[in-house]
């Protein structure tokens, strides 16, 4: 509806707090915030609304409902019957595929959140890329509990089935580990999207028959643990197909498929996506991954330069990930910024965390690097396991 009126939706993640939200507002020059009084009350988001109110108009859906009269309802009915004709009649301008379709925001893990501008062409290209390697059909039912303010939940979990004519069921929270499997059973879901954390939670709580109708489970956003794969294979007889992407690529850029699946990798690059590896000093195997394709973003918006689009250089998006390639399969070693140089050797902090997760699967762990007089840097491991012993790694 917003796009039909030449408005660009910007999907705000409400969880980071007022400072991050205000940075996102400034970056994309947001003027209007659409929300719900009930949502604000249940989420206890009054401080966030208070921070936005001086610079944005706050529009509550409950107030809009009371203003919808018979004429508006008639126009909505006609719009459902002939959407293109009504759109041109009401708004005149016919949009371009290269127009901005949506603005999403990065997590801000490396500074203030950045706005990511995606075009209609980028989203449609990614849909076609995924559909060319995965057999979606109108007989499928997609269950998506991922938040729509993230690219995985919005473009992969919502827009992909919507534009493909595939039925879908949206659920507002991925954290309801008992409820989501029950919904999968009730709606006869055939396709499920999730992260390793959420999928592991569903598997622990689900009855073995809850996922009886599921054909494919797609995972992204974080590495899938071997324990999660084992649990789904033994309890449900299902494989998890792991993919890889970011907001900047709308989001998918590689995926394992039923016919080409290598656990531990994130699959092969999708059709139409160019890849190249840049060598990184100290890392002998693999390199930093850059990608280019029609699904790549229009550019960034930054809070430091509100409304100024910063396109990727020559169309190449620098992922910042160190990867290796084997027969086209991409394996992620870690973020370029998350390597430590110990005694002249580059060591992946992510690899250490993965190893710790295999030894202590039920306890959170994190690795960090700090200066060392002789070795240059040393690595520290923080864990919630009370009786942790590094001797277990030897």
Q: Which residues make up each language-model segment?
A:
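Structural core segment of the AMP-binding/adenylate-forming
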Residues: 4-77, 90, 188, 195, ...
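Conserved pre-ATP/AMP-binding loop-to-beta segment of ANL
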Residues: 58-105, 112, 132-141
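Conserved S/T- and glycine-rich ATP-binding loop of Class I adenylate-forming
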Residues: 2, 33, 100, 106-109, ...
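Conserved AMP-binding
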Residues: 1, 5, 13, 136, ...
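Gly/Ser/Thr-rich phosphate-binding loop
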Residues: 61, 73-81, 166, 189-194, ...
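AMP-binding/adenylate-forming catalytic core of the ANL superfamily
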Residues: 33, 192, 287, 293, ...
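Conserved AMP-binding/adenylation subdomain of ANL enzymes
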Residues: 3, 124-141, 149-191, 204-205
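Conserved ATP/PPi-binding loop(s) of AMP-dependent carboxylate-activating enzymes
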Residues: 268-272, 281-313, 345-347
């Amino acid at each position: 509806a917003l796009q039909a009126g030449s408005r660009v939706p910007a999907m705000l993640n409400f969880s980071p707090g007022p400072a991050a939200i205000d940075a996102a507002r400034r970056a994309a020059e947001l003027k209007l915030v659409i929300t719900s009084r009930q949502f604000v009350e249940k989420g206890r988001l009054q401080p966030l609304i208070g921070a936005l109110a001086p610079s944005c108009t706050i529009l509550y859906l409950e107030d809009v409902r009371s203003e919808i009269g018979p004429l508006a309802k008639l126009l909505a009915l006609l719009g459902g019957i002939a959407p293109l004709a009504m759109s041109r009649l009401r708004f005149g301008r016919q949009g371009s595929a290269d127009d901005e379709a949506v603005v999403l925001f990065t997590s801000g893990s490396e500074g203030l959140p950045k706005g990511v501008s995606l075009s209609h062409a980028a989203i449609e290209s990614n849909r076609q890329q995924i559909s060319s390697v995965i057999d979606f059909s109108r007989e499928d039912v997609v269950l998506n509990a991922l938040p729509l303010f993230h690219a995985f939940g919005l473009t992969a979990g919502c827009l992909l089935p919507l534009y493909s004519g595939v039925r879908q069921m949206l659920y507002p929270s991925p954290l309801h580990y008992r409820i989501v499997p029950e919904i999968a059973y009730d709606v006869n879901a055939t396709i499920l999207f999730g992260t390793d954390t959420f999928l592991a939670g569903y598997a622990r709580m689900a009855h073995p028959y809850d996922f009886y109708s599921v054909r494919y489970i797609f995972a992204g956003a974080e590495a899938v643990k071997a324990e999660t794969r084992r649990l789904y294979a033994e309890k449900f007889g299902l494989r998890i197909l792991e993919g890889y992407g970011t907001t900047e690529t709308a989001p998918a850029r590689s995926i394992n498929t039923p016919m080409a699946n290598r656990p531990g990798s994130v699959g092969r690059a999708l059709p139409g996506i160019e890849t190249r590896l840049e060598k990184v000093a100290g890392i002998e195997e693999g390199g930093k991954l850059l990608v280019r394709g029609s699904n790549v973003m229009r550019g960034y918006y930054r809070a430091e330069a509100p409304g100024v689009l910063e396109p990727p250089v020559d169309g190449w998006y620098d992922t910042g990930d160190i990867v290796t390639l084997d027969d086209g399969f991409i394996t992620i070693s870690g973020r370029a910024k998350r390597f430590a140089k110990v005694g002249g050797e580059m060591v992946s902090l992510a690899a250490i965390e993965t190893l710790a997760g295999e030894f202590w699967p039920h306890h959170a762990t994190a690795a960090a690097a700090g200066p060392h007089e002789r070795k240059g840097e040393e690595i520290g491991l923080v864990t919630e396991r009370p009786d942790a012993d590094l001797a277990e790694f030897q």
